[in-house]
Design a protein with these regions (language model features):
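Active-site machinery of serine-nucleophile hydrolases
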Residues: 81, 87-150
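Primarily recognizes the serine-hydrolase "nucleophile elbow" in alpha/beta-hydrolase
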Residues: 162-218
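The feature captures the conserved acid-bearing segment of alpha/beta-hydrolase catalytic domains
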Residues: 197-284
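Bacterial N-terminal signal peptides
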Residues: 8-18
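Alpha/beta-hydrolase-fold serine-hydrolase catalytic core, especially in secreted/extracellular enzymes
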Residues: 27-30, 248-254, 260-413
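Gly/Ser-rich "nucleophile elbow"/oxyanion-hole loop immediately N-terminal to the catalytic nucleophile
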Residues: 76, 133-172, 182-187
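Loop/turn elements at helix/coil->beta-strand transitions in domains of secreted/extracellular proteins
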Residues: 76-81, 111-116, 161-165, 184-190, ...
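A domain-start/cap signature at the N-terminus of enzymes
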Residues: 24-81, 243-244, 381-382, 390-392
Length: 413
């Protein structure tokens, strides 16, 4: 009898030993932030959350963080998400407070029909977005893991549209938006950076520069990127290398500049470069193909690195537009065109024709193997092209006008 009792006790102990770690793992994997407060902000519902750190993030010490979820003015199922990274001079609360006044860090102001997620990196020392000070190199750092996990949690918790998640930031937050956003094209549809404080973060995260992308690293097609920086802002130094890298990689970049300093007031910036809000970055969807325009004939000369006192404003790819028509297993089709003067109020001279290379990104259904041949047509023009080592197809030297013209790409049988 005693032997039976000892065996039964041993079984119980063994079960508990297995259950405890399993329970701990389940709790860690679940990671449920605590809703600390419900309130109202500018006529919109506001939820305040607090949470600890997941072990997988890799923080050296335990820490607590806060994030805010701002609801749209009208409840909406499957709404898009606007994600905001604050500057070095703000924290999550003061960042949101800027949205009470037009002209105060306008990039922080979430559209009324969007949910918005405001994240914090001020509470814990060395946890800043740009990562280059503490987490150098291409590896995914703890802050980035926290941001991405929080975004995914909010999308799921609130039932949002995972294909319409947009990342933006000002200054240090702009640097973080580039550095975190470009590496996560599987999360963010598009990124917009207002006077990003440096491009070192994004350059290291994306292997821009002399070091090639390692063979064991796969980079998802990145978000469409909008960047507006000033040549008379010391934080913009190095942009020539960033712009070149984006062009060489055939990534989508809409770039604007002018002597507006380290500004955050759109009204003042628009007086210097009235194109900075001309591209509808919030219309990009993660589950739709897009064209990356490179080597465009209409690009302005860069002020970086040695014409920083130049008073001229300029742009890269500012006038290109597209409309998706078809994305099927046998072909992908989209209309390419230039913005018309009737649709774009600007002091810039709007070109009537441009020549550019066009690379198709985020193609959903047409599968092209690396090195495989495809046939293409663009109006009366036609030809063949081969996919690069990542399976990306580029058609070089297309002449694009204000008249929408269909680019069609098919696999070669």
């Amino acid at each position: 009898m005693n032997s039976l009792r000892r065996i039964a006790l041993l079984i119980v102990v063994m079960n508990l030993a297995g259950v405890a770690p399993a329970t701990a793992r389940a709790q860690e994997e679940k990671w449920a932030p605590e809703k600390a407060k419900e309130s109202e902000f500018n006529g919109r519902k506001l939820d305040t959350y607090r949470h600890g750190a997941r072990k997988e993030w890799g923080y050296a010490e335990p820490q607590r963080d806060t994030f805010l979820v701002l609801h749209p003015k009208q409840p909406k199922a499957g709404a898009p998400l606007y994600v905001v990274l604050h500057s070095a001079g703000h924290d999550v609360h003061s960042c949101l407070a800027c949205a009470t006044k037009v002209g105060n860090h306008d990039i922080y102001h979430a559209p009324p029909d969007f949910y918005a997620l405001y994240l914090d990196c001020r509470a814990n020392k060395g946890d800043w977005w740009w990562g280059s000070e503490k987490y150098k190199g291409p590896q995914v750092g703890p802050t980035e893991k926290r941001v991405v996990d929080t975004v995914k949690w909010v999308v799921k918790e609130y039932g949002l549209d995972e294909n319409r998640v947009y990342l933006c930031g000002n200054s240090m937050g702009g640097s973080g938006a580039l550095g975190i956003g470009l590496r996560h094209g599987d999360v963010f549809a598009a990124v917009k950076a207002n006077v990003p404080a440096g491009v070192e973060h994004v350059s290291s995260r994306m292997y821009f520069g002399a070091k090639p992308v390692p063979a064991d690293v796969t980079l998802a097609d990145p978000p469409v990127v909008v960047d507006y920086s000033a040549q008379n802002d010391s934080w913009s130094r190095g942009h020539e290398t960033f712009i070149k890298a984006m062009n060489d990689r055939r990534y989508a970049l809409f770039m604007y500049w002018g002597p507006f300093g380290h500004a955050n007031n759109h009204e003042q910036i628009l007086k210097v470069n009235d194109l900075v809000n001309s591209f509808d970055w919030l219309g990009v969807k993660k589950n739709e193909a897009y064209p990356a325009f490179t080597n465009a004939s209409t690009n302005d000369p860069l002020p970086w690195p040695d014409r920083l006192t130049d008073k001229k404003s300029g742009q890269v790819n500012a006038f290109f537009r597209w409309k998706n028509l078809r994305d099927a297993a046998d072909a992908v089709e989209m209309k390419l065109f230039l913005a018309r003067a009737a649709d774009l109020k600007t002091s810039f001279t709007i070109p009537t024709e441009a020549t550019a290379d066009v690379s198709l990104r985020r193609v959903q259904k047409l599968k092209v193997a690396p090195g495989a041949a495809v046939s293409w047509t663009f109006g009366a023009a036609k030809g063949e092209a081969r996919a690069d080592a990542q399976g990306c197809v580029t058609i070089t030297g297309l002449k694009i006008t204000a008249e929408p013209t269909t680019l069609s790409i098919r696999t070669t049988k």
